Amino acid sequence: MKNIFRKFVFTIFVCLINLQLIAASFNEKIPLYFKLTNENLLAGQNALNIDLCDSRIKEWCTKPQRELGLNGKKINDYISISPDIKGEWRFGWWYNINFTPESNFVAHQTYKITIEDYIFPNFVGLKSNNISFTTLPLLPIIKEMNYLQDNIDISKKFVQTKIAFNYPIDPKTLEERIEFIKSSTKEKLPFSIKFNTNNTEATIITNIPPLTDKEDTISVIIKDGVKPLHGGEVFTYKNVKDPNNKTPNNIRYSYKENVLIPSLSSYLKITNSTATIVKDDKLKPEQIIIITTNTPVSGEEIKKHLELFLLPQDKPAFLGVAGKKNYKWQNPKEITDDILKSSEKINFELLSSVPSITTMHSFKVDTFASRALLVKVNQGVKTSDNLTLGSDYFQIVQIPDNPKEVKLMSDGSILSLAGKRKLPVYSLGIDKLYLEIDRINQQEVNHLISQTNRYNIFQNPTFINEYTFNEYNISEVFQEEVIVNSQNLNLPHYTDLDFSKYFNLEEAGSYSKGLFLAKVYAKDNNNIISQDKRLILVTDLGCIVKTDKTGTHHIFVSYISNGKPAGGVKADIIGLNGEVLVSSKTDSKGHAVLSNINDFSKEKTPVAYILTTKDDFAFMPYSRIDRQVNYSRFDVAGAVSSDQGLKAYLFSDRGIYRPNEQGHIGIMLKQTDWQGKFDGLPLEIQVTNPRGKVIDKSKIVLDAEGFGEYLFSTLDDALTGLYNISLYLVGDKGSNNYLNSVSVRVGDFQPDRMKININFNNSQDELWTNPKDLKATVNLINLYGTPAENRKVSGFIDIRPTEFFVPRFKEYKFYSSKGNKEFFYERLGDITTDSKGTANFDLNLEKYYNATFNLTFSAEGFEPDSGRSVNASKSLIVSPLPYIIGFRSDSDLKYIKTKTSAAIEFIAISNKAEKVAAPNLTLNLKKINYVNNLVADSNGNYSYSSVPIETNISSDKINITANESYIYKVPTKEAGDYVIYLTDKEDTIFAQAEFSVIGEGNVTANLTDKANLKVKLDKDDYTAGDTILLNIITPYTGYGLITIETDKVHNFEWFKADENNSIQEIKIPDGFEGKGYVNVQFIRDIEATEIFISPFSYAVVPFTAGIYKHKQDIGLTLPAKIKSGEKLAIRYRTTNPGKIIIFAVDAGILSFAGYQTPDPLNYFINDKALEVRTSQIMDLILPERPLLMKAYMAAPAGDGCINVARNLNPFKRKSQPPIAFWSGILEADLDEREVTFDIPSYFNGTLRVIGVASSLDSIGTSKADLLVQSDLIINPNLPLFVAPNDEFTVPVTIFNNLKDSGNAQVFLNIETSEGLKILDYPKEIPIDENKEATINVKLKATDQLGSADLKVVASINHLKPDIISMAVVHSSELTSTTSVRPASPSVTTVNTGFITDNKANLKILRDVYPEFAKLQISASKSPLAIISGFKDFLDNYPYGCTEQLISQNFANILLYNEQELVQILKTDRKNMDESLSKIFQTLSERQNYDGGFRYWNNFNDDSDPFISVYAMHFLSEGATRYLAVPSDTFNQGIYYLENMANRSINSLDEAREKAYAVYILTQNSVITTSYIANILKYLDEYHKNTWQDDLTSVYLAASYKMLQMNEEAEKLLDRFTLNKPISKTDYQYYNPLIKYSQYLYLIAMHFPERLKDFDPKIVQDIALFAKDNYNSLSASYAIMASLAYADKINHVDEATIKVTSTDKEVTLKGNKVMIAELSVENKNIDLTSSSNGFFYQLLTSGYDKQLTENKEIVKGIEITKKYLDENNKEVSKVKLGDNITVEITMRSGSNKTLSNMVLIDLLPAGFELLPDNNHINILERTQEVMIWKPIYINNRDDRVMIFGTISDQKMTYQYKIKAVNKGIFSTPAIYSEAMYDPQTYYRGVIGNIIVE
């Protein structure tokens, strides 16, 4: 006790000292010293941690309580370590410094760390600014050393050793210095060794000799001399013994270890034994004893040595100890010889297993349940490699209790009324069954359906609210107890549940016929221990319902007992209240039609189909998914017609457009009967951008033929990505009916200049190709028609597994024995094309000669000296097989009845898809037997699993001839599963056919519940009125329904099939056109024995009829070749009078876009979906009781739009418009007409001309290509953009197309505009006629920003052959452009302040380019000075969430009627109107159904409360000024605010939002006193001491004021303190500038009288807060406050302010805001006022010429950007044409998540985004790095812009770029910022990358 007291006193004493020191530390310097916390871990690449400790307390490391303000900061610039090691230094969260090394420490090396003391605050004093430490020596840990043996190949025995080191080691030095020694012989054993990827862990396998009769030991020792991989002291065992070298978890460092090697009699062990209950295939429970061993042993061997004893139930008395009744035996040591003698020896049966030698052995016993068994395995058990069980094994196991179970048999719910009406009940271990039959009144079906679950009502009827409404509300209940008459309750018992006695057929008017809820359960002491229930319908009426496009219902009814159509059946649809909605009767064909009821609702909501006759009743739930037939596995997809029978087809002229381009969309509309006229039809086009926002709605008028066009326009700031142009039919009440759409892509692109083709040397029209000598030929062609010679081509092969499919023999199944199971990818290198543009690749497939695989050869062809390229790929099957063998059968091979005839046909096919001979084959027939293998699942539960074993039956030699197939007659005498193998003399398998022969009571292991129906039509195409012949192969006998369907049912036929193979027919109706579907539904015969598969099967097969009737032929006549700059004349004609559109497009654009020529005929005729929905109850039919019981005796039961305009490149190059011509709609008929287009002089290439024509009842397309060529064709490859000082090479290819010019000298003259400087180029070059040559022009980008031109003029002085000595100059010129843009994005900074005296000097710290730059000073005696810069900042704000768009426009509303200020600010009134109109429209689009507004234009986003209030504030101000605010948007917004004000409050931020909402509601004449009371109640309860100083109270005060409750308002204001600090939270809509601005605004608007005594410092503070802490919201609020305040103050003295800058002096006069525009060259600005005290605002906007010191700026976010090669290694030099990955890694610099972040990454010049993956993050997630998932990505040709949320964990984003030009290029500085926190941003550094 004394010691405890002393410790307590000492602790109190130290704490008091500590508290004194803490208190003193706020007034004096805190002396700190450095303490290394993890010195015993410093090795390898482990992190280093340093604590900063208060040196005044020596006993332990005490950390001061005063914040350093350095948490999370990266401090590499302030710390040095010697010797140097790269890594990241960072402050931790509390007086802690962490170092994460990028490379390994040196072993046993002393390091010195020096920390600059000026990084610390002034209150810190360092005892020393350095600390030293020594890393650990190289030390090993032998983690594992175990004897192991392979349980599959038991001869393999080995020792596995795992050794870890604390540093990466030199692998070779360990191999030389490690030994494994066998103790008995002292011999050194050989070993193999593998290292992990960083060489810190070795896994060593030591094979050992065969075991002997004696145990042995193997030792491992690591000798001195193992070397660390990265330098330092080598390993010595003395360091292991050093007690100072300890691991943190007390893991022992070690250099030697040993392991015991067992003897022959010590290794084999019985590891476990247990008893369990497992059901056999007859559902009979079996008692199983399971014995497991540690190594495989034969079950027979265990059986020989196994004894099982049933121990006595009672423990006998022994040596005076009393016995015990019902004793639970547990310990084998309790079993004496006497007890063993009194035990009963139990017989057992070994269960077969696969394989027979295994570690788990199962024995079946039959003994008493709940009794104990002694398991004894006598010593002497031997394995095949002589391992022996050295001692007896004893274990007591408990036999489990017998299971108790009850269930209704089979699946299904319908019993035939004409049958036995009985359903067996399966029971086990049950002596009494409790039955409950709830007979449901027919009139209550509506309640049954509406009150139960919507899925699977028959099999699992569950009432939704069973405590208030259940089966007893709608039924009559019958209960019965049934005694189970069974001699052995442990065997399955079957009790019939007879439904006949529960209904009376004689009661003609009875409404309680055949619908029951059957329940069966078992009890134990009145507790239900097992139960089952099922809805049972006893009926003879089966139905199929087909609902067509119009909602019409076709009811097909048949008798279940005989399959005949049921005539005279009343068919109704009933509603929710039970009343009949529509009714009809079936005709003699069992068919009835019920009309459309889609518009029925409320009490008439349809719930069921009801079928009734005099004495029968059936029903089916209406529109339930479990009753609908799923056709997804059939080819039923296609276009869907509108409700009005209209189909529309839209096509674009080229599929891809750059921003700010226009495109043409063609529209074609037809009625399904081709009869309609369409002039005057109300149609609308809607254009949706990639974010899902509708950006255009336009009314469209078509001509009578249904032909029209739409002009698609894009803006310069258009989002890149996929746009949908949709056509709608406008309804009567403004509702739109969708017809169709076309998608086009908007993005920067370069048209292809070449075409690439691939061919293989020996694969013409072949199914497969032999791999020997296989070659691929790549042909490159310039799109102006000449071979592309001397071009680099890269080749790649991709090899994957495949299967054969032969279209000509699609009914046959083919098998490939040469199975390649792996994937391979190989780069074949580069080849240069020859004079024909050809490159030949030898594929070198020798290593794959013995495999069959799918080969894809890919080629990439490059433009000369450029990285731009075209790609192509081609696939084929490669195999060495001489032929393949396929088989088919007219029988269903899964279900062949015994003693029936069935055959399998085999054919041999060559690679030409022709039948060939296949001699000398062997046909092996094998039977598949199934062994019930006992297996354990993951939970330890045991069950039988059927394992197939093949047994040889017969082997026959066969031949397949070329003319005849081989017909194999299937042996069907004996039931079972069989497999046929066809092999050649090398035992290569050519075919494998499996079949099952089904006999009575035989159900094989592979039966499924799916019934496959095979249907084949006699042909694919028909004429209307033809009869279709169907070959139907059914899984059982029965009857069926055949229908012809499209969007309606055209015809139907019932049929009956007494055999599994039958021919049926159905007629195509007269007048049928286009694509249709033959739908076959088949129902199992009531007497059929195939009861373990579904009684309902179906199949759908498409066909066509009359498809050429509506084809329109088009004749296009045009020249094959034309010169650039000439006029192209196209002559056209059509076979039928109508209209035509002709368009011509650069084939390079179409190639890049992957454009498909319009094919409207195929769409209107063939592209038609199956639109009839089918529902049925046939799959619920239960098998008859005798069939069911017969089978069960033998087998088991079958149970926000982001506007990034200002982030675009404003220095865009002036690109040439794309080559695309559009004629518009022209008249066309048999007379030939002409249309002309002007070909630009700069275009050379292929022009594709396409014509699309339409008449009332015909349509057609046609296309033709022509070449456009100049005498000299010039193709430069200029980068799309460059940065100042980039030096690069531009390849210019010139093709000599001048006839008779020979080997001509081509003279070159190259000029550039100011943005480019020529460094070098050749002035002339010889070029042969019809040849090309490439020159390289060396250029440098200058500081002149904007579009820069490169003009190339090539000329030939050509001597005319017919005029001697007369030379004619032939020349061509081409001007190409690039963008010279800075290597950093545009940044706007605003410097705001208040000057107390009359002078100020402002420094301009930025050096910006003059282009798009702005330097503006505004000044005033009033705070109006701040509105100019902030308005400019908002007008050019680069992002566009809902808040930012509102903030951009709030000033426009507030200034709308302020004419003087509008003029001073030079605001354009027209622009104001356009901007306001746009924001009103945007707010309407971003409004949710609840009336609130989304943050972005993402349709799934919830309404944002603050944004919604802010939006309504904006709209309210607009409505006050009588602007065109959408009334429905406004009214819905008010509704949202009312609901919002009623919600519960969970925080002060939420209270402020609700107070703001109440303020807006009050402003709009809503009585809000109750809302205010609720808010005040919450505030007083949860924020009693803080809320009075929050902006919340000012909003409430203003609301009180508007409610004329002045006293309450004044009280709130009097208690409010403005300058109370704001608590730091993650809430982003509240900061000091917002608080001060809104306070001033509310006071000025509602309490102007308080302005008389207003502290002017409040207004001045707004300017000071705005100095460096503004965002879009706070800037908007600051403008709002300034305007309101200026409007209310009585008088502002006129002032004169002189502005003196470098270039000029300006004198400003006025009493409002005064503005001066200055040159961006200024570095200093002096302001001199005529009186003291004025506000100013300095705005600087533009692109920085050089980043300050080119150092990264890290403000709360850290970003790393790397360029990685294909091996993920960082590179600064790449080769032309390389694809590289840009990897951006980022994380928050604090412990909080940063939301609303934007990241802008400019591409280096000479690179282009890869089109395939530039829109997604290509990374896969790893454990180390989180993959960033941005909210939105916008890609342009020179930049990637990404928006999202960044956490405090490392997050990585990747995209790929391609090097396309040689040169030295600037790598731009990456930039990121938080859109709501100006203090959080990042700017990287500018570097260089070389492309060579």
Swiss-Prot record:
Cited Pfam families: A2M (PF00207), A2M_BRD (PF07703), bMG10 (PF17973), bMG3 (PF11974), bMG5 (PF17972), bMG6 (PF17962), MG2 (PF01835)
Keyword Iron: no
Keyword Signal: yes
GO molecular function, one term: endopeptidase inhibitor activity
Gene3D superfamilies: 1.50.10.20, 2.60.40.1930
Cross-link (Isoglutamyl cysteine thioester (Cys-Gln)): 1441-1444
Domain of life: Bacteria
Keywords: Protease inhibitor, Signal, Thioester bond
Entries under InterPro entries matching the protein: A2M_N_BRD, Alpha_2_Macroglob_MG3, Bact_A2M_MG5, Bact_A2M_MG6, Bact_MG10, Macroglobln_a2, MG2, Terpenoid_cyclase/PrenylTrfase
Signal peptide bounds: 1-23
Record-stated family: Belongs to the protease inhibitor I39 (alpha-2-macroglobulin) family. Bacterial alpha-2-macroglobulin subfamily.
Biological function: Protects the bacterial cell from host peptidases.
Name of the molecule in the record: Alpha-2-macroglobulin
Protein source organism: Rickettsia conorii (strain ATCC VR-613 / Malish 7)
